[in-house]
UniProtKB/Swiss-Prot annotation:
PROSITE patterns: RIBOSOMAL_L20
Name the UniProt record assigns to this protein: Large ribosomal subunit protein bL20
Lineage of source species: Bacteria, Pseudomonadati, Chlamydiota, Chlamydiia, Chlamydiales
GO cellular component: ribonucleoprotein complex; ribosome
SUPFAM superfamilies (UniProt xref): Ribosomal protein L20
Keywords: Ribonucleoprotein, Ribosomal protein, RNA-binding, rRNA-binding
Recorded family membership: Belongs to the bacterial ribosomal protein bL20 family.
GO biological process: one example: ribosomal large subunit assembly
Amino acid sequence: MRATGSVASRCRRKRILKQAKGFWGDRKGHFRQSRSSVMRAMAFNYMHRKDRKGDFRSLWIARLNVASRINGLSYSRLINGLKCAGIDLNRKMLSEMAIHNPTGFAEVANQAKKALEANL
């Protein structure tokens, strides 16, 4: 009897068609169209998972810029002041602090200001 590998082939096709669920038209039900669409979708998925890290960093920096200007500093001077003061908070933590605890962020910004003045 000839071995066709039908079980493996069927599993592979089912997996691709399952991943294509929600696609439009032939892309969801026909294996050939589904395979190329799923591969393209997975490539975009990989790429955007990498992009997301930079997108969030940009968001944190924009938030910090606004919050630091409210406290009389620019973003770059805030970060420089924090480095001079030896305060080791990352941008995500600072951004969360600026949103949820503005008074605490104001204290941190004041310490950064003092460190900048002491450095001059």
